[in-house]
Structures are given as C-alpha cells and as structure tokens.
Amino acid sequence: MSAMTPREIVSELNRFIIGQDGAKRAVAIALRNRWRRMQLDEELRHEVTPKNILMIGPTGVGKTEIARRLAKLANAPFIKVEATKFTEVGYVGKEVDSIIRDLTDSAIKMVRSQAIDRNRNRAEEMAEERILDVLIPPAKNNWGQNETPAEPSSARQSFRKKLREGQLDDKEIEIDLAAISGGVEIMAPPGMEEMTSQLQSMFQNIGGQKQKPRKLKIKEAMKLLVEEEAAKLVNQEELKQEAIDAVEQHGIVFIDEIDKVCKRGESSGPDVSREGVQRDLLPLVEGCTVSTKHGMVKTDHILFIASGAFQVASPSDLIPELQGRLPIRVELQALTTNDFERILTEPSASITVQYKALMNTEGVNITFTPDGISKIAAAAWQVNETAENIGARRLHTVLERLMEEISYDASDLNGQSITIDAEYVSKHLDELVADEDLSRFIL
C-alpha cells in the first residue's frame, strides 16, 4: 500500500490531469485514509470503514483519467468497471459479484509479481547453475547419478565468468523447460465465466507439470529459467492468502457510468440493467462475503469510487440506499479554453509532446507556438459549444485533423522543421469550425 501523503498524491496527479482540484483532494484523502487505518490497533481498525466517493461531472473532464492514474499510485488491488456491463441476478449477463472476483484475480497477479521479484536473486543463481549444467555436464557416479564436486571446476568457473559478462548470450543450447499447457478453450455463456474458468483450471492441472526440451539462445533461456525458478520458490497457498488480505484491506473498485443505471422517471415493467443492478451493488458496498476460486473475500473495507456524467439523470435518481453509501460527493467542472491550453502544454506526456515525438521518428521537427496552442484550444472549445460537449477528448479530434497533412507527407519531409502557429491553425481549421454542419460531422 502506498504511504504517500495527500499533498504528494495531488502533486503526482497534477502531472497528468489539469484542474479538478476537488476530485484530486477527495481521492488523495481516501487513499491516505487507507494507510492511516492500517496504523490503528486491530480492534479499532475493524470498525473504521472507508468513505466511498461519488464523482459527478460532464464527459471528458478527467473522471476516468483520475481513476487510471490512481491505480498506478495506489500500489494496491484496483479494478475499473463499467456499471452498464452488469445485469440483475437471474438475468443473462454478468453479475456484480464478478467485480470482486476480477479484483481478486488482479491481486493474485500483483502479489505473484512481487513475490517473484523478491526471489529473483536466488532464481538467477539457480538458472545460472542449470545453464552451466548444460554447457559442462556434471560427472556421473557408478549409479548414473550426478556427482556434486566439493569445489567447482576451473572450466565451470571460466564459463560462469563468460556467462555473467554476456559473452555466451548468442550461443544456442537445448534445455528442458516447463511445457506451457495450451489448456482447453471453453466458450463461456454470459454470466457463467466463473464456472468455465474453474473447469479450465481443472483441465490444466490434469497430467501435472511436464518438461519439454527447447532450443534457445542463452540470453533468452536465462530469462525463461529465471521466471520458472522464481515461480517454484513461491508458495501458492501463502500467495492466495496474501492476495485475499490485500483485497480485503486495500482493494479499490472504480465504477464508471453509474448514472446509466439510474431509473429515469416513472416506468413500468422489468428494468433489468438499472435498479436491479443498483440493488445488487448494495451488499458489495455495504459489506458482504463473496465466493471466489481463491477463497472467500469480505468486502467490508474495500473502497468504492463511483462516477457518472449525470446529464440526463441526477444523483438523486440513484436508489436512496446506494446514495447513503456514497457519502462523499465531488463535482468536476466543465473545461474552459484556458484548461484546454494547459492540457496541451503542462502534462509530462501531453498530446503535443506525443505528436512531436511521433513526427521526430520520421526526421520532422514540429514546433507549437503559444499563439498556435491558444488557437487550437479556442477551436476545440468552440466546437464543444456548438456541437456535443465531449470535453478534453475534442482536442484529439481537432489535433488529428490539424496534423493529418503533415502525418501523411512526413516520410517526404525528412530533415524539415514545421512551425504550427495561429496562422497555420486558421488555415487548416477555421473553415471547419465556422461551418456548424461540417464541424458536427468532422470535428
């Protein structure tokens, strides 16, 4: 679990997301509270439950991006799901319990990766010995068994030195590696993914682990052997328990498009994908026990962050019980022209930086001037105002249109420098932006 302070978390998010300080502060405090809770004594820790968050704001203002960046910062089991993918229990489709199963799977993967990293040094030594055994086969005794000499031979030491220095990287050897099972591919009916994954695991375990000889270059063989030896050093039962503990104590679930499962107005008849889904989410958010193939998982201390545009529905259209379980409300603001300018220049991997790097691969040097950036931002904002407002995503559309000619001719422009200023932007975009019909369909 990350021990970053709220100020450090916000500072890190500022590198990628412009504005939305309220949302950043809310997720930063929620993340820090996870760490604070773990410092309490066990009795009080059990009583402290996470304060779930509801993020409200139009599309393209950074809700999903905050979740994506938070996942990397958290160093904790994290999953992002779309509320629209689930249906009420009893109907064909994914049940909400699969959220916790997927979260547990991601935790298993994360914990296994950490365990392999911890054992990497020992695994590298064992892999090195296996390669040396192939290069210099050990002597055998009268019973045909390998003899372990008291001291390694000078030839073995010489090969070890060459191996570590990379002199043997391109030499090809034949070595026994664990055979990768092709498995049995089972097409999962909707809502039965859990059962089919268990069947696949059962078929894969039949016959046990087999060794298969493969011819590889030493450099490639070393990588595969290190992974194989590290996996042997990992205790699978301990790994499962560690992953379940990580999910229960530090897990974070981000539910996007929560507004799409709101019941709008009075309607009769079954509402499979809306109110029923909300009711199924209630026990997860409140705290229940979910059965997974790795064991039982309690959801009492999992943090839930829900988000939605709420353009047609409003947060009050959520069922009252779910509203009560999302106590922290954060409203994200629509983006202005100034925000667009900052989005184009401030993030460490902004869209303009990406385009410069892409064109640089063809030997074309692109320069964006401040007035050019302002003009692009103004064009994107104007199209958002006249057509559908899709927030920062509009910048991708506008820039792609602006760079189309350069991208097409880039291979013929090797060694040239192109400056994108206000005049260049006006020449390529003004006509499209001014014509509402054209901008609606092209930008």
UniProtKB/Swiss-Prot annotation:
User: Which InterPro entries does the record cross-reference, listed alphabetically?
Assistant: AAA+_ATPase (IPR003593), ATP-dep_Clp_protease_ClpX (IPR050052), ATPase_AAA_core (IPR003959), Clp_ATPase_C (IPR019489), HslU (IPR004491), P-loop_NTPase (IPR027417)
Q: Which GO terms describe its biological process?
A: protein unfolding; proteolysis involved in protein catabolic process
In which compartments does the protein localize? Cytoplasm
Per UniProt, the keywords (alphabetical) are: ATP-binding, Chaperone, Cytoplasm, Nucleotide-binding
SMART domains in UniProt? AAA (SM00382), ClpB_D2-small (SM01086)
Binding of ATP occurs at I18, G60, V61, G62, K63, T64, E65, D256, E321, R393
What is the protein name for this chain? ATP-dependent protease ATPase subunit HslU
PANTHER family referenced in this protein's UniProt entry, alphabetically: ATP-DEPENDENT CLP PROTEASE ATP-BINDING SUBUNIT CLPX-LIKE, MITOCHONDRIAL-RELATED (PTHR48102), ATP-DEPENDENT PROTEASE ATPASE SUBUNIT HSLU (PTHR48102:SF3)
What this chain does, per the entry, is described as: ATPase subunit of a proteasome-like degradation complex; this subunit has chaperone activity. The binding of ATP and its subsequent hydrolysis by HslU are essential for unfolding of protein substrates subsequently hydrolyzed by HslV. HslU recognizes the N-terminal part of its protein substrates and unfolds these before they are guided to HslV for hydrolysis.
The molecular function GO annotations come to: ATP binding; ATP hydrolysis activity; peptidase activity; proteasome-activating activity
**What are the start and end residues of every segment in region (Disordered)?**
139-158
The signal peptide annotation in the UniProt record is none
What transmembrane ranges does the database entry give?
none
Q: Organism, per UniProt?
A: Erwinia tasmaniensis (strain DSM 17950 / CFBP 7177 / CIP 109463 / NCPPB 4357 / Et1/99)
Q: Report the sequence similarity comment from the record.
A: Belongs to the ClpX chaperone family. HslU subfamily.
Q: Name one GO cellular component term.
A: HslUV protease complex
Give the organism's phylogenetic lineage: Bacteria, Pseudomonadati, Pseudomonadota, Gammaproteobacteria, Enterobacterales
List, alphabetically, the Gene3D superfamilies matched: 1.10.8.60, DNA helicase RuvA subunit, C-terminal domain (1.10.8.10), P-loop containing nucleotide triphosphate hydrolases (3.40.50.300)
